[in-house]
Amino acid sequence: MARTVLVRRLLLVLALFPAAAFAQELFGAFAYSAKEKKHGWAINYPTKEAAEKAALEHCQKNAETCQNILWFRNACGALVTGPEGFGAEWAEDQTHAVNKALKACATRSSSCAVTATYCTAKPK
């Protein structure tokens, strides 16, 4: 009887607090200066805003014209650059993020190459 009551209480708690409330969201971001060809990144921040701020600050250590170009949540981001442009994309895994960024860069530039790729830690 006590076990049944405990199970019912546990089910009630789980119903009141959806699984999303227990999931940890981790954010990453890239900032880039197309003029100066410098980038900054941030990974595993608790909010999008914090990740973007950190990426911009990281980029601004080496360049003056940095802008936030990509953010991602519980995923991977890739920055691909070429002489005339860049591509920045995200996906659930590194391979797909890189492939998407390569394709985006190829529409703007020749000789695109992977500049950076990072993935957030797996959510707990």
Residue spans of the language-model regions?
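Helix-coil modules at protein/domain termini and other flexible surface or pore-lining loops
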Residues: 2-9, 21-124
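Sec-dependent, cleavable N-terminal signal peptides
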Residues: 15-21
